[in-house]
Amino acid sequence: MKKILFVTSEARPFAASGGLGDVAGSLPVSLKEAGGEDVDVRVVMPLYASVSQEFRDQMTLKCKFTVKLAWRMQYCGVFELVRDGVTYYFIDNEYYFKRNSLYGSFDDGERFAYFSKAVLDMLDPIGFVPDVLHANDWQSALCVIYHKCRDYYPAMKCVFTIHNIEYQGKYSFAILGDVFDLPQSAENVVGFDGSINLLKGAIVCCDALTTVSPQYANEIKSEYFAQGLHGIINANAYKLSGILNGIDTVYYNPESDSEIPNEFTAKCISGKAKNKAELQKELGLPVKPDTPIIAMISRLVSHKGLDLVCRVAEDMLNADVQLVILGTGESVYENFFRDIADRYPDKVSANIAFDKFLAKRIYASSDIFLMPSKSEPCGLAQMISARYGTVPVVRETGGLYDSIKPYNPETDQGNGITFATYNAHDMLDAIWRALAFYSDKPVWKKIRKNAMKSDFTWGRSAKEYLDLYKNL
């Protein structure tokens, strides 16, 4: 039996703030389902203040011990919970994890150094030393680095996944020993460009390196995408692979989704039309069944391609369309969408908020989903929109390239519309193509059906990870 420990700083449904939480909430369960009796998959994460009492009531205290982090001697409690066949461990320390948010504290470096040290220190007390420790992003990078520098368990292999190379865990060398409890000799391991870089350290130290889509694995070898780490990535390319994320197709299922007004299927789509009318009413837009809704559900930040949207928004709105925006982010984009909604009240609904229930209704009601990202390691929104029959229009980058294939009228293959060059008018041309397809009802029905039948399950990804673990 292969023993796997999945180390993460967040996981749904316990505590999450982004894509890593979705992955950590779904992949371990799928690994267990795919591996059956041949794998023992367990997950460890911090016990944040935001973990609900409902889950706390299901936990049992597994063990308590003291973690030595340089001169600090810190309490650690390990709580255990079993859910969907997977054992979850929660690292308890209120000083580090009883905060208002998961990240963004001045001492995040110390918090996650403690977490990483606690993970390795707990293995003997809980009686579970894994064959493979699978760490994720800079917050658990020190698990891999500590293991390499201290050789905790010689037989244990380490897999490290980069979910977004922009976040690297950079700190001053002044805290190498005082906070990270690393010897001076570790400077060569974690040092990069004049500072500590935890992501770089894990890349160098791990036995296998993965990222969240095959295309992103190729992209981060280039200077444009690698945020300075292209040399390190290329030096370690022999152990790099890209495995496309999936989505939770039970939660995101238009056939049985209690969070949308009307359920529907690829064969019986009438519920989607009803949802569209209800969404138009809810958002104060004219109820026009034949006017396509173009939706964006996104963080309103530059790398999501919003500068392209701002550049040609007026051109887009000259067509018979309605534009629905949901998200928060940089004030320049929030204000732009508020302004354009004021000027085009019958065409634009700008919802500057985070609302997962409204997001579901938008996915289930819209016709076209726009995702013109400058970079996108994997992306989940394009998969969710396709699942709900909202045809994605995406730029060919990262996971968007791997998951959305352009519709070909000659073969009737393809589940969306794509464009390659990061250019506002190339994006606009893709939108015009989508609108032309939309006006041809038999063609649009085929594209929508292809999108809804796309395989975005975690099962495929889980098998690739299991093969990776076996080959270490």
Predicted region positions:
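Catalytic cores of nucleotide-sugar-dependent glycosyltransferases that transfer UDP/GDP/TDP-activated
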Residues: 1-472
